[in-house]
Amino acid sequence: GSYLPRQGSFLIQPKDTFFGLTGPNVVRSVLGEDVSADELGGPEVHSQSGVTDFIVEDEIAALRKGRELLRYLPDNNSVMAPHYPTSDPIDRDTKDIDILLRNAFNSPTGFNTPIDFYIIIQQLCDHGDFLEIQPSRARNTVTALGRMGGNVIGFVANNSAVSSGQIDI
């Protein structure tokens, strides 16, 4: 396991990187098991366990992802998250949401009809832009940051389009 990196608020891990308390050589010598660094502490392992929030291509992409993330976060706990003026009208029509919900609620399965919440989040956010946190983990739950009217909002949505939205973690 990896404990110290997860003590931060968000963790961005480039592909082809490893972090952990011990490496493959220690596992081999102590347990006699032959595992690779990637299997032990690579980005795929950590994204599935919830340790890594974002997997990116390389260190440059990690810096870009960090900058993208910082656009949604306040400088400290005593101030609000940054407001960005938007040209996206707050009162615009969201016909796709209306169609999606009408089809779901008018279907024979009613409230049990799967709804893809990515569509709803995209329709609600300014210009359809949002940042999903831990996109590789728990596809049945969407956790994201976005903006409405230039103000930062957070989403935690049960995505019934995946595994009927059942919480399985």
Language model segments and positions:
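Conserved catalytic cores of soluble enzyme domains
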Residues: 1-78
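Generic secondary-structure boundary/loop-capping signal
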Residues: 16-18, 23-28, 32, 37, ...
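Short acidic (Asp/Glu) and glycine-rich catalytic loops that position anionic groups and cofactors
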Residues: 23-24, 43-50, 91-102, 154-158
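Charge-rich, low-complexity amphipathic helices
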Residues: 26-27, 33-34, 68-69, 84, ...
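Short, exposed beta-strand "edge-strand" segments with a Pro/Gly-rich flavor and a Y/T-containing core
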Residues: 32-35, 50-57, 104-115, 160-167
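Terminal amphipathic helices with adjacent charged low-complexity linkers/tails
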Residues: 57-121
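Non-catalytic terminal/interface segments that mediate subunit docking, oligomerization
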Residues: 111-169
